[in-house]
């Protein structure tokens, strides 16, 4: 018999997104971070092999607003250099994602119409994939350029609930170890999946939330801790009888911020199979 409790811990089952472009309107910081690495994406794109078509993917794209200007500029650069190859862009996220706003954005029906590259440029095709990025999403050897920003800190499932906080940064040692192990497995799966998808000479550029050498992370860079504030308010709801103990615990974020060592671990000798000779390296 299936474990009903375990099912509720699966990220694809429990996460949802508010619509109408809510995400992009409230994540200017993510857009600023994405815009800052435009040059890296340009170099990656201009180094791609001369395939018949170019297939790009934006993994964990949300409503597409934070990366829209980046993709617009990349396509504009290609076209300005006389590269008129067909371009497919696959946006991936959970099935509950705000794909409606995403498709409207790219056609100029919503948001920044001057960046609606699907309408502005010829021979550009936009698709969506409503499956999480912890598994292979595209046919092997078909992806020219993969990109992901501020998304892959999400784990595929919560290995446990956190009893006295809302986020792993405030969890006890046992809970942290379980999340760390889950995140390690997920990170290897992510890299192996992208390696299978990439065509020869393909590139994958990924920008993630993490914990730096000083222990800083999103919402904890000096002053108040964002997640401690979240927990304080959520705990107050429990103390006041507004929510139950179960509801408090179930609010555990399905996230883990990796350290540099955790990001680099799959590339160590002990996990060298990440880069199989028959597959392109990530």
Task: Annotate the PLM regions.
Residues 147:
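A conserved beta-strand element that flanks and buttresses the S-adenosyl-L-methionine
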Residues 166-174, 182-200:
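A short glycine-rich, Lys/Arg-flanked "PGG" loop and its adjoining helix->strand segment in the class I
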Residues 1-139, 154-171, 206-214:
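N-terminal charged/capping segments associated with class I S-adenosyl-L-methionine
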């Amino acid at each position: 018999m299936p474990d009903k409790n375990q099912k509720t811990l699966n990220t694809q089952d429990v996460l949802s997104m508010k619509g109408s472009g809510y995400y992009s309107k409230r994540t200017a910081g993510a857009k600023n971070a994405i815009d800052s690495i435009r040059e890296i994406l340009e170099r990656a794109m201009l180094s791609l092999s001369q395939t018949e078509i170019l297939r790009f993917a934006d993994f964990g794209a949300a409503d597409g607003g934070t990366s829209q200007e980046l993709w617009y500029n990349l396509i504009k650069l290609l076209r300005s250099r006389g590269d008129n190859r067909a371009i497919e862009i696959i946006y991936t996220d959970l099935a509950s994602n705000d794909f409606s706003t995403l498709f409207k954005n790219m056609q100029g029906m919503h948001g920044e119409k001057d960046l609606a590259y699907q309408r502005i440029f010829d021979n550009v095709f936009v698709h969506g994939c409503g499956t999480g990025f912890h598994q292979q999403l595209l046919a092997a050897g078909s992806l020219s350029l993969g990109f992901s920003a501020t998304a892959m800190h999400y784990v595929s499932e919560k290995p446990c609930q956190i009893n006295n906080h809302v986020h792993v940064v405030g969890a006890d040692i046992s809970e942290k170890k379980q999340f760390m192990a889950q995140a390690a497995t997920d990170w290897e799966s992510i890299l192996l999946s992208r390696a299978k998808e990439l065509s020869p000479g393909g590139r994958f550029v990924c920008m993630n939330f993490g914990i730096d050498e000083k222990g800083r992370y999103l919402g904890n860079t000096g002053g108040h801790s964002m997640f401690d504030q979240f927990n304080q308010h959520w705990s107050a709801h429990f103390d006041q009888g507004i929510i139950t103990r179960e509801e408090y615990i179930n609010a555990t974020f399905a996230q883990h911020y990796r350290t540099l060592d955790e990001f680099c671990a799959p590339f160590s000798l002990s996990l060298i199979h990440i880069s199989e000779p028959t597959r392109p390296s990530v």
